[in-house]
Curated annotation (Swiss-Prot):
It is found in: Secreted. The lineage of its organism: Eukaryota, Metazoa, Chordata, Craniata, Vertebrata. The modification Phosphothreonine is found at residues 157, 193. The gene is IGFBP1. This is Insulin-like growth factor-binding protein 1. Changing residue 246 to W: Loss of binding to ITGA5. Residues 26-107 form the IGFBP N-terminal domain. PROSITE patterns: IGFBP_N_1, IGFBP_N_2, THYROGLOBULIN_1_1, THYROGLOBULIN_1_2.
Length: 259
């Protein structure tokens, strides 16, 4: 049986999770908050100095996060004047933010260009791009007054970003990094199509070398935990016999069995 290209597999997954919305021109909208959902919200502490809602599609008001607090797609928003960013040196910034492993920093610090790294600069002809560069160019940060989540801010600014200077991703050798770029590119293009509403999506979980972590999970914006599954690190294809569950599928067990 011939192998199905990874990009095609992702396209199928995206089509399965895209639903046609009813509001033209607003493709990145969360599902409406029903009275039942709002009734289940816990009260906000009286000591809270700034009330906001969660950064994802949660319905409950939350206390805005202070400077230095952990943050991400599904957490409360950072307080006014702060932005949620991946920690310095984070090898998987996009994935870290979907897991709530970012931190609230001053907006001035978040928008400042990174200091040059020690060592030799990359060749100007290089078409390599790291996940950290993706984070910087997609501006993965959201002030507390924004209506969209951190991740939607990233996707909405992607198409207009001219800082990537990517000329030919076919020259890239890292399969997960290639898929990550294509996923975000496809989501950005989907935003241009009015009426689309995405509540679940998949961002490849890449290691620092651009290959796949054995556990891959979808990200859910509807409050429900996303599905996780196991893949081979070198090509991202499902490990036969491994489960697809909402939780930890213990991929190392299945990986060891296959090897």
């Amino acid at each position: 049986m011939s192998e199905v290209p990874v990009a095609r597999v992702w396209l199928v997954l995206l089509l399965l999770t895209v639903q046609v919305g009813v509001t033209a021109g607003a493709p990145w909208q969360c599902a409406p908050c029903s009275a039942e959902k709002l009734a289940l919200c816990p009260p906000v502490s009286a000591s809270c100095s700034e009330v906001t809602r969660s950064a994802g599609c949660g319905c409950c008001p939350m206390c805005a996060l202070p400077l230095g607090a952990a943050c991400g797609v599904a957490t409360a928003r950072c307080a006014r004047g702060l932005s949620c960013r991946a920690l310095p040196g984070e090898q998987q910034p996009l994935h870290a933010l979907t897991r709530g492993q970012g931190a609230c920093v001053q907006e001035s610090d978040a928008s400042a260009p990174h200091a040059a790294e020690a060592g030799s600069p990359e060749s100007p002809e290089s078409t390599e791009i790291t996940e950290e560069e993706l984070l910087d160019n997609f501006h993965l940060m959201a002030p507390s007054e924004e209506d969209h989540s951190i991740l939607w801010d990233a996707i909405s600014t992607y198409d207009g970003s001219k800082a990537l200077h990517v000329t030919n991703i076919k020259k890239w050798k890292e399969p997960c990094r290639i898929e990550l770029y294509r996923v975000v590119e496809s989501l950005a293009k989907a935003q241009e199509t009015s009426g689309e509403e995405i509540s679940k999506f998949y961002l490849p979980n890449c290691n620092k070398n651009g290959f796949y972590h054995s556990r891959q999970c979808e990200t859910s914006m509807d409050g429900e935990a996303g599905l996780c599954w196991c893949v081979y690190p070198w090509n991202g294809k499902r490990i036969p016999g491994s489960p697809e569950i909402r939780g930890d599928p213990n991929c190392q067990i299945y990986f060891n069995v296959q090897n």
